[in-house]
Amino acid sequence: MKKRLVYLFSVVFFVFLGLLQLGLKPQKVEAAYGILHPYSTPVATRGNWYYLDRDSKGTQKIYTVKITAHAVDKDKLYVPSQKYFEKHVYNASEKKRNQFIEKTKNIYAGYNYKKGFNVNNWVSLAGDGVYYIPVTRKVKGKKVKALHIATGAGPYTAAYAYKTKKLARLAK
């Protein structure tokens, strides 16, 4: 009888531990914030791109943009669920919406745009994000692949990036 009681207690204890472990697993971010799945960037835009711009002191400097399959400069991109946003964001109280915006300030949405894509805040309040569009440009009389980086509703050109630092310097 005593052995049976110890055995039963042991089984109940291990089942309890197993259930406790299931409950402690972190919830998926996808479900919490309306993420459908990771956004896949167009293949033509992937890689390291270099562009020439002025820094805060006014001197010209080469900047790098790294685009991978699902990220721009290590910022992961996701596709948002419109159903989730309609239910939990657009029709939520101002207080809840502001809390949601604060929680998701480091999550970015990716959208297809022409042959490129657009990156915007998870909940866009103003502006239209940054566009990355593959184009062909002439540098010193030769056609080369470039990345048109643009912002705003226009979209308005911010820079043209190239596959090498040398091309970025030559293009000016």
Roles of regions detected by a PLM:
Residues 1-31:
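Sec-dependent N-terminal signal peptides of Gram-positive bacterial secreted proteins and lipoproteins
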Residues 29-172:
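Mature, Sec-exported extracytoplasmic domains of Gram-positive
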